[in-house]
């Protein structure tokens, strides 16, 4: 460890503290104790290319711990990425390139957004899954084309280790025998409340060794040579690696080792103390040219070596006449994995009737052969959800090119793993029962924030399957899904709408939630593929006069149409509107909305879910026929009757409201 290393590390510390002090918020403790690790990663290990930051074989860095973000931004700045002094000065400010929780921005060196504690672990695992999949696709074309061998590094804190989704992702990584995955854990045993001895039991090293990780634990966390040795050993271990840094929080601060240094700016005296201790008297937000050159030269020297070998392999690949290989390289270079699925190309027999879960299996397998980049799985629910492609062979280290992923009962990790895979350009899906939505909600929000086209398939969508009891009967989940920004939720009524949903999903670059029933439903008269793109459409037009409108989604459309037919015999002429996507309908222009649902006409909504969001459609709250309480456990028809949501009860309510 030379003086140039020491100086650069100390400048990273002070620069990061300047950012926190300028923002008047942040976490100086982790910045001070992890600066040697961050510097060593960039200076001695990381294969990144500041002049070509989106190069597809670059190493990835994921910050599961948001607290370390000012240190990461400072390192990017020192390394020559497009993070300016002004960006650092605007840390945590509106519209800045340096938000407190990093947001996906590949050109700036930010490979993933940071969410809740532990979320980045699953994202890192997903990136590794995708790397392995692509790497083996390329090697399948030519065994010498090792074009994708990057490593993913994930920074962790004690909070990440305590997260529930963390254990799900860790165990999945071991089950998949992943490699090229290194976790860098700041084990400072402190949060804002104080020491963690009573909430984070010891023996972390033994725990991860027992799981199957490569584990190294460093007490000397300031020695660049030793840190580099540990990281390199983990990288080359052939296993997921956990490198534990037994740090003292807030190293060199007046409050070193105390919880007060966990969060909040340092005092002026403490900041001045650090500058004196490090003999750094540059103005705030300044770093020396010497330190920039010292770090850049190490990164460039390593890059030149790796790129020469890689470019030779890439030239070899480009000379191979293979459409498959070309499509892989194009995806990796552009990030686009377009899949063409045109619903109208398929004819549905008139007598078609089956569970939408069964129909969904068939549609997935119509899409499957269209692209090698379409894959996914379920959280221990494939037997009932049938979200499986082709046969029942699953992806593993022995079968890395299989397209089915067995996530196990890990809904939380599944969503984050899917996000990591989508960051690499794959079109992925994951499924579970709708009642388990809350288990994976954080991952859905991260998909939406990063704009990743992940498809979430939720089955068993209502109280029609009530035998298990209220804890496993959805009630407000549809409302939650429909109110996630930048996500489109679909609830198709039949096979036509289901196929239209998939055409829309594959044509859009935002995440989607597809909610489907286990009910057996017929091909409905008036149903069509194209109506899905508008969100809602007239599935049954009134005969002559318009006495009222019923709006429904999913399997309730079947009941709504029958109610309309029956009440026509009693003199009520009713239009039925199918609403496969309320999100899309509400984004249509007012003229279209008025054409489908005239505001002057009494409009009733029928849906076996919470009715809160339907006040934008129904004429009045009493015209929302919904389920706004926990359901009962029991035989479905008895439960429906008890909750006055059986067919006869609904028909009476509609007749009463329209009369």
Regions found by a protein language model. Name each.
Residues 157, 432-433, 552, 578:
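Glycine-rich anion-binding loop/nest that anchors nucleotide
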Residues 153, 375-377, 549-551:
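Conserved beta-strand elements of the Class I
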């Amino acid at each position: 460890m030379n003086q140039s290393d020491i100086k650069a590390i100390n400048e990273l510390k002070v620069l990061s503290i300047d950012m926190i002090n300028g923002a008047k918020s942040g976490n100086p403790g982790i910045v001070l104790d992890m600066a040697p690790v961050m510097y060593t990663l960039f200076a001695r290990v990381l294969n990144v290319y500041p002049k070509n930051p989106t190069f597809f074989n670059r190493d990835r860095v994921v910050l599961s711990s948001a607290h370390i973000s000012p240190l990461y931004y400072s390192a990017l700045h020192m390394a020559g990425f497009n993070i300016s002094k002004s960006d650092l000065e605007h840390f945590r400010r509106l519209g800045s390139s340096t938000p407190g929780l990093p947001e996906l921005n590949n050109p700036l060196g930010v490979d993933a957004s940071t969410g809740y504690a532990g979320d980045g672990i699953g994202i890192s695992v997903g990136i590794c899954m995708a790397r392995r999949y692509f790497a083996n696709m390329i090697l399948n074309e030519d065994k010498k084309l090792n074009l994708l061998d990057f490593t993913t590094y994930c920074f962790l804190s004690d909070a990440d280790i305590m997260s529930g989704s963390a254990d799900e992702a860790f165990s999945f990584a071991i089950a998949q025998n992943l490699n090229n995955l290194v976790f860098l854990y700041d084990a400072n045993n402190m949060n804002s409340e104080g020491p963690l001895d009573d909430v984070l039991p010891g023996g972390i090293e033994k725990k991860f060794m027992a799981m199957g990780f490569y584990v190294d634990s460093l007490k000397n966390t300031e020695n660049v040579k030793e840190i580099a040795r540990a990281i390199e050993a983990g990288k080359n271990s052939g296993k997921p690696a956990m490198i534990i840094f037994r740090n003292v929080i807030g190293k060199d601060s007046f409050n070193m080792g105390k919880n007060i240094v966990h969060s909040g700016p340092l005092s002026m005296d403490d900041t001045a103390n650090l500058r004196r201790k490090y003999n750094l008297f540059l103005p705030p937000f300044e770093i020396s040219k010497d330190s920039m050159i010292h770090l850049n030269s190490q990164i460039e020297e390593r890059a030149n070596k790796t790129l020469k070998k890689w470019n030779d392999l890439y030239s070899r690949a480009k000379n191979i006449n293979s459409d498959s290989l070309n499509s892989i390289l194009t995806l990796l270079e552009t990030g686009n994995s377009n899949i063409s699925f045109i619903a109208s190309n398929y004819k549905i027999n008139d007598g078609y009737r089956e569970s939408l879960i069964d129909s969904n299996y068939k549609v997935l397998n119509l899409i499957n052969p269209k692209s090698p980049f379409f894959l996914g799985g379920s959280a221990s629910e494939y037997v009932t959800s049938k979200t499986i492609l082709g046969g029942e062979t699953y992806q593993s280290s022995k079968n890395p090119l299989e397209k089915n992923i067995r996530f196990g009962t890990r809904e939380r990790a599944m969503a984050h793993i899917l996000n990591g895979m989508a960051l690499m350009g794959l079109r992925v899906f994951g499924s579970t029962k709708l009642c388990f939505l809350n288990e994976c909600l954080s991952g859905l929000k991260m998909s939406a924030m990063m704009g990743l086209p992940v498809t979430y398939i939720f089955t068993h969508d209502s109280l029609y399957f009530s035998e298990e009891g209220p804890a496993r009967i959805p009630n407000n989940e549809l409302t939650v899904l429909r109110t996630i920004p930048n996500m489109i939720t679909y609830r198709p009524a039949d096979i036509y709408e289901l196929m239209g949903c998939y055409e829309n999903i594959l044509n859009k670059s935002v995440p989607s939630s597809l909610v489907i029933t286990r009910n057996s439903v017929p091909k409905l008269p008036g149903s069509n593929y194209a109506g899905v793109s508008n969100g809602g459409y007239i599935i049954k037009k009134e005969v002559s006069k318009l006495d009222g409108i019923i709006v429904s989604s999913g399997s309730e459309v079947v009941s709504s149409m029958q109610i309309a037919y029956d009440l026509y015999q009693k003199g009520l002429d009713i239009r039925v509107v199918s609403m496969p996507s309320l999100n899309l309908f509400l984004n249509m222009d007012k003229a279209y909305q008025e054409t489908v649902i005239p505001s002057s006409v009494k409009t009733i909504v029928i849906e076996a879910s919470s009715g809160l969001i339907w006040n934008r459609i129904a004429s009045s709250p009493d015209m929302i026929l919904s389920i706004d309480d926990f359901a009962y456990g029991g035989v479905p028809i008895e439960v429906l009757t008890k909750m006055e949501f059986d067919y006869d009860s609904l028909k009476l309510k509609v007749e009463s409201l329209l009369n």
